[in-house]
Amino acid sequence: CLVGSEMCIRDRANTAVSLANFNVDTRYVTKLPKHTIGQSAVNSLRQYGVDVSRIVRGGDQIGIYFLEKKTSQRPTNVIYNRNGSAFALATKEDFDWDSIFDGATWFHFSGITPAISDNMAEITIEACKEAKKRGITVSCDLNYRSKLWSSEKANKVMSEVCRYVDICIANEDDAVGIFGMDASKSDKEKNAYIAEE
């Protein structure tokens, strides 16, 4: 959660806010409803110095998730409520890549983005292609979430996405969940596997 904010923002927004705190120019791209809750999300980002001028407005719902904290022997549980959100229902036509990438040198996204919906998977691939066409560095934090998509679907989509990624951030769970990598292999074997893929 962002310090001093009642709204909890995760994933790419935290990356943008963290960079803005180090005086790095950041721009956040998403689609949010044009109502009070959507505006609150925009304002929350803006207050930290994040450029929100490319946020697309439309749709009715904002995607959310609930975090049930661990108690006693019950593990932490995340409940996603993102189906039907403005972001999940976004289309390729919503995003003007010339405007979005104008002056950009780096494009970062989370692996949660293409997991949100088939539309977002297609849009993520298109965004990566458009960034690469412009010579922009592309980075991805895989963030595999089995509650959002199967390993098979994640593998299919992320294998395509990663063709355009310069820097891929992952932990062993991400590598196993998305690419089926055997985390018990030696570093030499892992590196050879990654290079082959």
Positions of predicted regions on the chain:
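Conserved N-terminal subdomain of the carbohydrate kinase-like
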Residues: 25-111
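Single conserved hydrophobic/aromatic residue that forms the stacking wall/gate
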Residues: 1-4, 9
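Active-site glycine- and acidic-residue-rich loops that bind
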Residues: 86-88, 113-122, 145-155, 189-192
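Hydrophobic faces of well-ordered beta-strands that scaffold small-molecule active sites
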Residues: 138-140, 168
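Structural alpha-helical scaffold elements that stabilize or flank donor/cofactor-binding regions
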Residues: 1, 99-100, 160-161
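A short helix->loop->beta-strand "cap" motif at the edges of active sites that frequently abuts
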Residues: 130-137
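Alpha-helix C-terminal capping segments
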Residues: 14-25
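Conserved phosphate/ATP/ADP-binding segment of small-molecule kinases
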Residues: 148-197
